[in-house]
């Protein structure tokens, strides 16, 4: 079902047209169901193998849909809420264009008790390539009441898609503002 809808939009992209508004509305309705999101994910995997440039362009035109779905998934139970940041990370939906609504929703998930929500939100945020975004996320995690393992954080920082040296400078500049536990994770990143 998704395949036919998406392939029609890919054909539009191939002819220099935009993704249709009615398609965006269709996705906004259908993808609020986690089962449909899983099917959409599988369809996107195929599309990326077959036509990576068109798949990237297609997703880049879905900004409003992504913001809407971020809000909707944020209201779901924690396991379902954790799934959407995974999709954001997997397809780098906020890479070099951090939609403030999506990034703000990821910050909200960092405050959740669920480690899945927090880890997937951080993974999504690493794809922004934005040092300020990561520093804010680190401060949220550090100020939270839930434990976030330093190894997860140190390894995650290596996934940052932006300039690692610039991130290192930001971390060094604010190092003293963080708890000893957070400093350990930061030191692991800085050593690499």
Model-predicted regions and their roles:
Residues 1-75:
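N-terminal topogenic membrane-targeting module
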Residues 42-46, 50-60, 82-94, 119-128, ...:
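Structural detector for internal amphipathic alpha-helices that build alpha-solenoid repeat scaffolds
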Residues 65-105, 114-123:
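Structured extramembrane domains adjacent to transmembrane segments
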Residues 76-77, 113-115, 144-150, 178-179:
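Short inter-helical turns and helix N-cap capping residues of alpha-solenoid HEAT/ARM repeat scaffolds
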Residues 78, 129-130:
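Membrane-embedded alpha-helical core segments of multi-pass
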């Amino acid at each position: 079902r998704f395949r036919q809808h998406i392939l029609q939009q890919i054909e539009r992209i191939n002819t220099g047209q935009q993704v249709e508004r009615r398609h965006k509305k269709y996705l906004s309705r259908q993808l609020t169901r986690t089962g449909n999101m899983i099917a959409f994910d599988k369809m996107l995997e195929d599309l990326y193998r077959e036509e990576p440039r068109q798949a990237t362009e297609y997703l880049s035109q879905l900004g409003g849909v992504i913001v809407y779905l971020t809000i909707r998934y944020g209201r779901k139970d924690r396991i379902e809420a954790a799934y959407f940041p995974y999709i954001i990370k997997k397809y780098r939906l906020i890479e070099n264009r951090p939609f403030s609504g999506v990034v703000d929703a990821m910050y909200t998930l960092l405050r959740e008790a669920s480690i899945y929500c927090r880890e997937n939100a951080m993974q999504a945020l690493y794809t922004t390539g934005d040092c300020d975004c990561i520093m804010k996320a680190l401060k949220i995690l550090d100020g939270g009441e839930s434990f976030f393992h330093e190894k997860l954080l140190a390894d995650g920082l290596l996934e940052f898609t932006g300039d690692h040296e610039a991130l290192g400078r930001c971390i060094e500049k604010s190092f003293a503002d963080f708890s000893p536990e957070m400093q350990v994770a930061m030191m692991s990143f800085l050593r690499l």
